[in-house]
């Protein structure tokens, strides 16, 4: 199997796993009383969390595919890029969250998705073509 195909399969699999884990964590948080409402009273649905996790993870896999094709050191660039993007992704939950429990949960969801997708894709990028 080519590296591109392995990257697509691994990346999509990691995206689905990350989305499922995020959905479970969000549902548990909601059951524990975290309202997951951002400023303005807009509640974030669990299905929305899962959907956005998949979409942004797939976008990350596309970035990895581009790095694999056009970079001499795709793993290093993947890790640098994902560290920056993960850090940037933590800003909106902190700024938009209505309360500390919601902000903490949203930050945890971002970090959980990164903890699943980033190493899975990095391992695939390390595999010879």
Please tell me what each predicted stretch does.
Residues 1-29:
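N-terminal signal-anchor transmembrane alpha-helix
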Residues 7, 65-84:
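Internal alpha-helical transmembrane segments of multi-pass membrane proteins
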Residues 8-16, 50-54, 79-83, 104-108:
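Hydrophobic alpha-helical transmembrane segments
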Residues 10-18, 112-129:
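Membrane-water interface at the C-terminal end of transmembrane alpha helices
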Residues 18-30, 57-65, 114-119:
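Transmembrane alpha-helical segments of multi-pass membrane transport proteins and ion-pumping complexes
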Residues 31-42, 97-98:
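Membrane-interface helix termini and inter-helical loops of multi-pass transporters
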Residues 46-65, 80-91:
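Core segments of alpha-helical transmembrane spans in multipass integral membrane proteins
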Residues 91-105:
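Membrane-helix boundary connector in multi-pass membrane proteins
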